[in-house]
Every structure is written in C-alpha cells, then in structure tokens.
Amino acid sequence: MATRILRTFDELKSNSQTGLITYLTAGFPNQDLCLDIINELSKSGSDLIEIGMPFSDPMAEGPIIQQSSKIALDNGHTMELTFDLIKKFRTKNSQTPI
C-alpha cells in the first residue's frame, strides 16, 4: 500500500505539477490555533504538511523555527501533545499527508 506522501508525489508527477509543502512547529502559537492552522493549510491547497517537533535546543534550525519551538515549549507543548494534534487533524482529514 502506498503512503499518502508517495501517492501525492506520484499524482503531482503524473500531472506535471509541482507541490506545495508547508511547515509549522507543533504547538505554535498554541495547541488550538495550531490545529486551526493545520486545517486551513490543508483546505488552502497544501499538498503535504510538515509538522516539526518543538525541541529545546534546535541548533540546526533558523531563528524563526527556534523561536516558534521556544514559544511552544514555554506553553507546555510536549511530544505527546504533538501526536494528539495529529490525531485530532486525522478525525477530519484522512488524506492530506503529514
């Protein structure tokens, strides 16, 4: 069985299209708004949504992602909450690759 990501790339390729891949930090600016943003990204045409896990020492990331990680962690975001966020998204959208 092909994954959602592979199916999306195959479909884009077969239609000679490029895809829109969006990124956000889980839990930023807070859990509820993050879920709203993910839903809107999907509705607005994002072909794939990358959700970054906030990390306390994101040295490989640029300043914007570092700051969003800090804010998410300062608000109490955890890895478990990231998985909860994705589960909530999946209850309404089973197709958009994450």
Mark where each language-model region is:
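N-terminal amphipathic alpha-helix/helix-capping segment at the start of soluble metabolic enzymes
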Residues: 1-21, 86, 91
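Glycine-rich, proline-tolerant flexible connector loops at the mouths of alpha/beta enzymes
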Residues: 28-31, 44-77
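Hydrophobic faces of well-ordered beta-strands that scaffold small-molecule active sites
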Residues: 20-24, 49-51, 98
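Active-site mouth loops of central-metabolism enzymes
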Residues: 20-34
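A conditional alpha-helix N-cap/helix-loop micro-motif detector
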Residues: 2, 31, 79-82
